[in-house]
Amino acid sequence: MKNFFKKAFLALCIISIASCSDDDDTIFIPDSMTIADFVSDNADYSSLLAALQRTGLDVALNGNGTFTVFAPNNAAFTEFLDGASLDDVPDATLEQILRNHVLGTTETAADLTTGYVKNIATETNSGANISMYINTTNGVVINGESTVTTPDIMTDNGVIHAVDKVIPLPTMLTFVGLDSNFSTLATVATTTTGFNTDFETVLSAEDSNLTLLAPDNDAFADLGDISGVSAAALEQILLNHVLAGTNVSTALTTTYSNTLATYGDTMNNLSIYINTDSGVSFNGISDVSEADIVASNGVIHKVDAVITLPTVVTFATADANFSTLVSALTDLTPMTDFAAILSRTEGGNLDLINPAFTVFAPTNAAFDALTSIPDESGLTPILLHHVIGAANVRSGDLSDGLVTPGTLEGDALTVSIPGTNGAIANLTDGAGNDDIEIVAVDVQASNGVIHVINKVMVPNPLD
């Protein structure tokens, strides 16, 4: 008899839902009715029930909690399966698809606003919860796929919003295409002709496992007119916003990483400097404005500036470990515009100082070890002694006994491998000092490469 009244009351609620024309009306289910009960007792959700039971999620949705479920009916499942059977969907995939319809908090229709929320599905590589893009401009639309048809079916462990389509797991391309803040990025990445990279495929492939640093529309506007930028250069700029691996914000640390952009015609990936001292910034020019937009195949961090291709100067100025070097190259040597010289990306310069540049960059500690820093007339040749022109000499090019091409000062350097104290290699400078240790290598810029050294090198004093 109790079940009879329970089902009769439920039927009355369903009739009320079907006849309701005001989307703001809230439908209340008896306090004893859980989300799982509602699905179980409503024949139009039998496909959803079967999926929940198969994955064990019916148990979770029958217990205590504060859930929001976007519930597809049978017609939505039929359309999604497109002639296949629910049994054809692998268990793990089905569970993630179902989780993609569930929020861990109770959100009524009035609580939902245009933007991102997290559901309880997870991205495979990072374990982070997947994002969901809600658009409330005209009703409630989820990930551009599924529209809420009946909102606010209240239960004792959350709320159900009936939706007209199953919500597939989103890819990075899903969010770039849907979020109006990324409309310029979407246009540039998917409509520019002449690219060798198919960005649509890169951002939509199930196994991408990438991090996209996505400039918003304002970032592109600040960059200025890009109509004159070649397709090859523009492609590299876009690739400079993509990192291998799904790197959520909590996994980022202050360090160098690599992007998918490459140096010249080589396969050497460009470096990117990540600084997490105050928020997250890249190459000292672009800050994360919204982190962790997690897709099924990677993560997006929205950034406020386009990350242009770095020069060796970019890294020197971005990395605080080189602040004394930067001061030496600028404030202490005003007669030589080192910043402009080392920012060059084209050859054929009248002074014969041409990229690529190989820079052996002393740390702040290296400068601190000096008794004093010479005046400009003495400092300029010292700085020139740290740069090789017209050569991108990477660590793989170094060998024991190698004598490098002459530095911009004139003297060559001699390489010793292995280095002392665990260093990658040692250098002997023009003055014969053989204890200069290379402690980090291959910070690859678009116009050269930086290797970090622990001492300031000195040219031959007799030159």
Predicted regions and their residues:
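Mature, structured domains of secreted/extracytosolic soluble proteins
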Residues: 4-7, 20-463
